[in-house]
Structure formats: C-alpha cells, structure tokens
Amino acid sequence: VVYWANEEKATKIKLRIIQSYFALTTKEMLEQRFELIERYRKEIGPYLTIMDSVGTSIEEVDEYAKLNKPDIMFCDQLDKFRIKGEYNRGDERLKETYVTAREIAKRNSCLVWAVSQASYDAHDRQFIDYAMLDNSKTGKAGEADIIIGIGKTGSSEVDNIVRHICISKNKINGWHGMI
C-alpha cells in the first residue's frame, strides 16, 4: 500500500494509520512503544509506504506504479497533484487528472483511491453525494467506480464525532445508499 500525502504531513498520516491498526489511543501507544516497534516492523512496515508528496505530479505517481507495482495507492488529495498540459478551466484539469489516475490503475492492475474535498454544499450535511465534489462538474464522478461521501449531522461548532457514510455511485455492484 502506498499513501501519497500532499494534504497533511506524512508523519501525521502514518501515526494515524499505525494507531488505527493497533486500535490504541496516543497515550497507550506511548506507553507500549517499545513492544509496538517490533510489531510495526513485522506487521506494517513491509506493506506500507507513505510518501510526503507536496508538489508531486500525476506523472510521478504513474512512474512509481510502473516501477514498484503496488496493489493499492491512496492519493490524498488527488486534486492537488500537478498534471502536464494547458487547460482553460479548473474542472478540465481535474477531469484529466482523474482520467490519468484511472489509466494508472488499469495499466498497473492496482487500486487507486482518490481522496477529494467536498464543496461548500456539503457543509454540515449528512448525505454527501458525488454532485458535491469540490470544483468538478462531472469529470471526477465520471472516472470513479465508486464514490463514498463522509458526512455528519449537526453543526461544525459542536463536538460531533458521529459520521455518516454514503455510497452515491457504485459501478462495482450497483448498490448505493447510506451505511
């Protein structure tokens, strides 16, 4: 698994992944750090690469996939990856970025998971569908096999940890709706 982190620091993402894998709080991880280091080296390290990818181009992702043959690549945020070419509008550039990501997946027989922001229309919404993808008309949605929106109820002002998962597009088996 490769995680291209161009939104948050790669070290922060790595810590979250490790913490989720071990199902421990930050405090518990600190208390058990010496035991966890060996487990990390055996259970996670050989299978996870996290790249700090600010300024990375989609062409670099393509080259990496050709050389390293990963099974899964997360591109967080795919919208921020650079791409060659001249585009009249931002949505045209985004569509080409998503087309290229899809082609990378097909050529390299790997899953490419694109992470994208939702537009302001999704703010404080429970049901977030593909029409709410940021800065895209239909380009992003057209290239995706599955689109998962993560929403919430209630105001952003309150401490609300409940999230709602919405499958708004699913070419894999056709099912869509709330989980």
What are these regions (language model features)?
Residues 48-107:
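Phosphate-binding/switch loop-helix module in NTP-utilizing enzymes
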Residues 96-179:
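Phosphate-binding/switch region of NTP-binding enzymes
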Residues 16-19, 65, 87-90, 126-130, ...:
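Short, glycine/charged-enriched secondary-structure capping and boundary segments
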Residues 2, 14, 18, 62-66, ...:
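Generic hydrophobic alpha-helical scaffold/packing signal
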Residues 4-6, 51-53, 75-76, 115-116, ...:
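Generic beta-strand/beta-sheet core signal
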Residues 1-69, 83, 179:
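Cytosolic-facing regulatory segments adjacent to core modules
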Residues 9-13, 58, 80-84, 120-123, ...:
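Flexible loop/turn segments at secondary-structure boundaries
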Residues 9-13, 33-36, 57-61, 74, ...:
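Helical mechanochemical/support elements of P-loop NTPase systems and associated helical scaffolds
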